[in-house]
Regions:
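A structural signal for short, well-ordered beta-strand segments and their strand-loop junctions
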Residues: 91-93, 122-126, 161-163
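Class I S-adenosyl-L-methionine-dependent methyltransferase catalytic core
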Residues: 1-77, 96-110, 134-150, 155-396
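Short boundary motifs at domain starts and secondary-structure transition points
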Residues: 78-83
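A gly/proline- and charged-residue-enriched helix-loop-helix capping module
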Residues: 101, 107-108, 112-132
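Nucleotide donor/acceptor-binding cores
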Residues: 86-90, 216-217
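Generic hydrophobic/packing signal
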Residues: 94-96, 115, 119, 166
Length: 396
């Protein structure tokens, strides 16, 4: 059993885990338990956009008291690491507790003292907060070697879990893929690579169409922009297919994918061409469709009612026509993950697209998730007016 520390918007993060691993459940409001199959007993954190840290569950402690968890840690690891060769680097992160960093650090210091008397050298990563940041975990390589350990201690409703980290999100690689690409365009929106990963994973595990000559599943993005979704899909070893109304965007995506190919020293199966998503006929096969659709114009403050009616009507028309055009071109059961706009008002309420209640008429159904409702899949920052609402659909 594994535990995942979920990202800034936990509902989206747990939905991603459920689509990838299946047997997933909430443990606390910021964490999820994941049952992995025996043949692949780990969480591939570098493939997940919504998991900050992952760990293998080692101990379970009844109750909700930090002292009980602290005693268990000292008792278990003073025995497990006694007379161990080489220095152990240890960090401790405590989630859901009221204790401050000094209390968390104290547990590490007590353990360090006990291990010293049994001949084991321990270096403690200092706690500025009760939780080590993802950056601290990543830069100290915690969870990536036997002698570099982060204990992830999480308090949930049903007790306390102590897990050994199997790694933190690689923020350096994500930043390099985001900012290092040769072609970027703020006007068409900047889809974060993490969100692209989440959306691809929300399509679920993909398999090759047996009637095609392809050796990899092929993923289509019909609003390709600068190619962030295709870039992340290529890193997951999918064949990638992108179209866009603007020739410039198709060119930019080509440049970005060629850059990635050179950087990875790994060939990518790429298909790109111009095309209006409302009318294009795409090449086959298409094993999944993942896209950030047209979001309308950006707003720095909530628009007037008349402006909102205009923008909402325009985006709803484009995205409805796209879904209508796509439906006869894909097979029953094909996943379609689409980010569409939702507009936040001054009270924090959202206005949604009319098409959200009409997906059945357009030829699709919502994928039913056990842990979240479809209306919880809203991706936004507190200061954003236009949120991305993620639709996880399947072709009827």
């Amino acid at each position: 059993m594994h535990i995942s520390i979920l990202g800034r918007q936990p509902a989206i993060s747990i939905a991603e885990l459920e689509r990838v691993y299946g047997d997933v459940s909430w443990f606390s409001d910021i964490s999820a338990l994941v049952q992995t199959p025996a043949e692949a007993d780990y969480i591939d954190i570098q493939r997940l956009g919504g998991t900050q840290k992952a760990g293998r569950v080692v101990l379970q402690v009844p109750g909700r008291d930090w002292r009980a968890a602290s005693l268990k840690i000292v008792q278990h690891y003073s025995q497990a690491w006694a007379r161990r060769e080489g220095k152990v680097t240890l960090g401790i992160s405590a989630y859901g507790f009221t204790e401050g960093p000094r209390d968390i650090q104290k547990t590490g210091l007590v353990l360090k003292s006990k291990l010293k008397s049994s001949g084991t050298s321990l270096r403690l990563v200092p706690n500025q907060e009760s939780i080590l940041s993802t950056a601290t975990s990543h830069h100290n390589k915690l969870g990536l070697a036997d002698n570099k350990v982060e204990l992830i201690v999480v308090r949930g409703q049903s007790g306390i879990i102590i897990a050994e980290s199997t790694g933190a999100q690689n923020i350096t690689a994500l930043a390099a893929r985001d900012q290092g690409r040769p072609r970027r365009d703020a006007f068409v929106g900047m889809l974060p690579p993490k969100l692209a990963q989440i959306m691809i994973n929300l399509a679920g595990p993909l398999s090759v169409d047996p009637s095609s000559a392809m050796t990899q599943p092929r993923l289509l993005d019909p609003f390709v922009g600068t190619g962030v979704i295709l870039q992340e899909a290529a890193l997951m070893h999918y064949a990638v297919y992108g179209t866009d109304l603007a020739e410039k965007m198709v060119r930019f995506t080509g440049d970005n994918l060629n850059w990635l190919q050179e950087k990875q020293k790994d060939p990518i199966n790429i298909t790109l061409h111009e095309g209006d998503a409302m009318t294009t006929t795409w090449e086959q096969p298409i094993d999944a469709v993942v896209a950030e659709g047209y979001l309308g114009q950006p707003f720095s403050a909530p628009p007037s009612n008349s402006k909102l009616v205009e923008v909402r009507g325009n985006t709803n028309h484009i995205l409805s026509e796209f879904l209508k055009n796509l439906a006869p071109q894909i097979k029953t059961g094909t996943p379609v993950v689409l980010a569409v706009p939702a507009w936040k008002d001054t009270e924090g309420h959202f206005t949604h697209l009319p098409l959200l209640t009409k997906v059945e008429e357009l030829g699709y159904s919502y994928v039913q998730l056990r842990n979240v409702r479809p209306d919880q899949l809203l991706y936004f920052r507190p200061d954003q007016v236009v949120a991305r609402e993620i639709l996880v659909l399947v072709k009827n």
